[in-house]
Amino acid sequence: MEIFDTKIEASNPGTLLVDVNRIIDTAPHSRNEAIASFLRIVRICEERGSGFDRMEEGMRDLTIPAPKVECGDDFTRTKLYWYANLNDWKREDKIRTCYLYTCYCYVNEIEVANAVLRERFGVEEKNKAIISRIIKDTMNAGLIKLSDVNVAPKLRRYIPYWA
């Protein structure tokens, strides 16, 4: 664990057992289910697969970027960023946050519209063009898509690319 002025990095030996882009919705896997089950029983850890969902809820409440997960050949690193202002966020932070929040909403059966993302990013209604740009960038990255291509722009809803 390393702590910096604007981020916290946590590294772990071994790679993820699931695709990093499907970390919110994929059924969890354990390297050692017997130990994992025991740790849940003694309340050292919680139910499998709820960590990133709960992390996204916390990030949303603080209006900070979604975690960045990097996988190497023999390690996984998670970076949690702390930016005071959306203007300080990097473009990739905005795209990652839009995508992961869309995934979070999808698995929780919440429709994602511009207003939902404005709330996630802490953007006022009068600045909705900022969110429209983030949505466009995330769609261009191939991470989200329209849930219905035949609706008017004000009625657009978004879902993850894999939905």
Language model features with spans:
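C-terminal regulatory or interaction extensions
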Residues: 1-163
